[in-house]
Amino acid sequence: MAGAIIENMSTRKLCIVGGILLVFQVIAFLVGGLIAPSPTTAVPYMSVKCIDVRKNHHKTKWLMPWGPNHCEKLKDFDEAVSRQIEANDIVFAVHIPLPSKEMSPWFQFMLFIMQLDIAFKMDNDLKENAEITLDVSLAYRDDMFNDWEEIAHAIEIRKLKCTFGSPKTLESEGRHYDCDFLPFMEIGSVAHKYYLINIRLPVNERKGINVGIGEVKDIRLVGIHQNGGFTKVWFAMKTFLTPSILIIMVWYWRRITLMTRAPVLLEKVIFALGISMTFINIPVEWFSIGFDWTWMLLFGDIRQGIFYAMLLSFWIIFCGEHMMDQNERNRLSGYWKQVGPIAVGSFCLFIFDMCERGVQLKNPFYSIWTTEVGTELAMAFIIVAGICLCLYFLFLCFMVFQVFRNISGKQSSLPAMSKARRLHYEGLIFRFKFLMLITLACAAMTVIFFIVSQVTEGHWKWGDITIQVNSAFFTGIYGMWNLYVFALMFLYAPSHKNYGEDQSNGDLGVSSGEELQLTTTITHVDGPTEVYKLARKEAQE
């Protein structure tokens, strides 16, 4: 008889393999917790109010908040009123990064959110459901003396969601509203050293532009970028894991091709899972250090989506191949009800991502959540994907229940066997249940560490040792799924250990009648695994 390596491996060897994988798992968490810094850094920026003295030439002039060529500044809007400076001549300028610092390609991306300081005034109150129109421009340069080069310019509208905690009376004038943060900008690469943002709030009373938005005192931005130290650790992990998964994948497929039969469906799915994991691992991000690849965030989302779709499909097919009879097994079309929700949900999330980050490739200030239509469209895609995910897990839970029920039903036949044969089949059942529990543990660890990373301060301090929880989450979970795929391809590769007729029926002390009672008629030595044979007879009956 021949089957998977896990079915011919002794418990001692299986424990050794599990121990080695556990050591690598601990190392993956420690790399993020002890070596890598926090994954991201948030930097607050206060805009500087500049006077655009060159009227009607807004698009040809960049206003710097500081430096040798800084703009003419306004202290506050009272000064603007006293000097009779109109709102259309005021520009909010933000230089990135702060003085004496430089941006780096190791930061990988920049995400900005906006906070408006809006004061209450009786004659300029903030209307309900007010919208603010922003005329925003983004430029870059790589030297303090070079001219600014435009990256993007757009007219964007943001909805204001503000509350006022005091009565709206004369005594409350000057107090600020409590406004929600607004999405402002996202760029998928940091290829330049210096960036400049100019923000205008154009006013047109006839068209109702920026009317009824209250008295905007200041504009604050919070910039979030990936830490360079974390990026280097992340790239190093990808560089190390890529050949590891690639080698085991080649080894796995070579063992399959050496068999005299065609690959079965489960073997193909495991191989496809290895390909999708390799697709994630390949460190193409190294090229982003030298090239301005703004599409890397979108590309990363697509890679992760392919992997998770394959992982969910594998779990369904893994359970199904241990439950279905010979006529239904080994055909992908037999799983259309279970795999269909995965495909629909993945497609919805892909469309949503293209509507958000796909558009941001041309307009980094765009956000699908800023309009009623965009919000409804985004929510529709997310809700459909959520429904598909729920359907998937219902199918998966039902199939897992069916498999365990079938195997439990066959366990009643085990006492009638010889001791050696009974121990053999008990080992097969244990190994199947073991993989199911490991899968559950991996999923649970992913959820637990995600929750912990959200509710903690980002790091734990034990004496002189600081553990970066968020970094440990990223590196640990990333390493865990790599080890999971590695273990699948190693343990479920075809075993070349064959028992002769005398050995299989003599040494194990089993009669031919006993063999026929527990398995279907499989005469080929390269046939399905033993757990398939054991579980499938229940379905046939």
From Swiss-Prot:
Chain segments annotated as transmembrane: 233-253, 269-289, 304-324, 332-352, 381-401, 432-452, 472-492
Membrane topology: Multi-pass membrane protein
Keyword terms, alphabetized: Cytoplasmic vesicle, Developmental protein, Golgi apparatus, Membrane, Signal, Transmembrane, Transmembrane helix, Wnt signaling pathway
Any single Gene Ontology cellular-component annotation: endomembrane system
Topological domains, Lumenal: 43-232, 290-303, 353-380, 453-471
BP GO annotations: intracellular protein transport; positive regulation of Wnt protein secretion; positive regulation of Wnt signaling pathway; Wnt protein secretion; Wnt signaling pathway
Domain of life: Eukaryota
InterPro entries associated with the record: WLS-like_TM (IPR047843), WLS_GOLD (IPR053936), Wntless (IPR009551)
Signal peptide: 1-42
Pfam family, one: WLS_GOLD
Ranges per topology, Cytoplasmic: 254-268, 325-331, 402-431, 493-541
Major localization class: Golgi
Keyword hit for Nucleotide-binding: no
Function according to Swiss-Prot or TrEMBL: May play an essential role in Wnt signaling pathway. May be required for Wnt-dependent patterning processes.
Family: Belongs to the wntless family.
Protein name per its UniProtKB record: Protein wntless homolog
Gene name of this polypeptide: WLS
